[in-house]
Amino acid sequence: MLKDKLQPFINRFEEINQLLMSSEITSDIKRMTDLSKEQSSIQPIVSKAKEYIKVLEDIEENKLMLDDPELGDLAKEELKELETRKPELEEEIKVLMIPKDPNDDRNIYLELRAGTGGDEAAIFVGDLFRAYLRYAENNGWKVEIMSSSDSESGGYKEIVILVKGDHVYSKLKFEGGTHRVQRVPATESQGRVHTSAITVAVMPEVDDVEIEINENDLKIDVMRASGNGGQSVNTTDSAVRITHIPSGIVVTNQDQKSQHKNKDRALKVLKAKLYEIEMEKKMEAEGATRKEQVGTGDRSGRIRTYNYPQNRISDHRINLTLYRLDYIMNDGLFGEVIDPLIADHQSKLIEANGL
């Protein structure tokens, strides 16, 4: 019974309240901080749990009054409202009881890279980047371009951005994968639809202490930064390319005029990429069930199609199709695609955890 599962949360919340008032805890800053964080994390569940228990009590109380000649009609009305609220609360509580993804509150690095389709793929990298930018603005997030490689035809061969704000990873973690675009290129005289693809990687921002990199594992090259067509964008050797020898990962940054800043940015992106690899290894070790629960963000999997002639966007993981591609891309309304993905993910987790 759900009520029985909720009581331990209420008990623990009240226990922490008592502990935080004791002199033994108030003199220990670390212990006090840890307890405060734990209390904050369970507070939403406790709040809903108390409301739920009150609803259950009110339902029983109103049932007893149904035959009362004076209060029967009022009890019937209240009972109707309470019976409607009960399942709503149950669903809200189940979502709150889902084990939390430790990365959900992190900022992210979002890497968009042109794949098959040449110029069209690069142009779509630019289009999708701008759509994410609008979605970020709608959520009050901040976006910083970490590195970019322009395409001569417009758009980007590759762009890496840092997205900062509340719940960034929790909302964008399902964007990792292959995004396919179908449209008529501006240069196509016959009006034929071309198909191209880009890949998106979502990497949580990590602290320096979480990923340690041995300097001996790095090969660092500096070079003259260049723009479209190879023209020099500044006259110093400020561009930095870092190769992580054990993994073979290569990160390049030339967006800043300072070599030191470019190296610092490249190292941050490298750490995020290495953290992503560690996450994948951990999921492999925990098995396919865990992989299904958290969503893999596998870059090789085609996750979504953007069909411009039909004004259609389709997410293949949940069989979602919307004929609002123009609004979603131009107004940053990615919530229309992302929210159903989150809801589907939550329902799978509720089932997997027996809630």
From Swiss-Prot:
This protein's UniProt keywords: Cytoplasm, Methylation, Protein biosynthesis
One of the record's GO cellular component terms: cytoplasm
SUPFAM superfamilies cross-referenced by the UniProt entry: Release factor (SSF75620)
Disulphide bond pairs: none
Compartments (UniProt record): Cytoplasm
Main location per the UniProt record: cytoplasm
Entry-linked InterPro entries: PCRF, Pep_chain_release_fac_I, Pep_chain_release_fac_I_sf, Prokaryotic/Mito_RF, RF-1
Keyword Transferase carried by entry: no
UniProt key word Protein biosynthesis: yes
Post-translational modification: Methylated by PrmC. Methylation increases the termination efficiency of RF1.
Residues carrying N5-methylglutamine: Q231
Sample GO molecular function, one term: translation release factor activity, codon specific
PANTHER family (alphabetical): LD18447P
Function: Peptide chain release factor 1 directs the termination of translation in response to the peptide chain termination codons UAG and UAA.
Annotated family: Belongs to the prokaryotic/mitochondrial release factor family.
Name of the protein described by the UniProt record: Peptide chain release factor 1
Record organism: Aliarcobacter butzleri (strain RM4018)
The organism's taxonomic lineage, starting at the top: Bacteria, Pseudomonadati, Campylobacterota, Epsilonproteobacteria, Campylobacterales
This protein's encoding gene: prfA
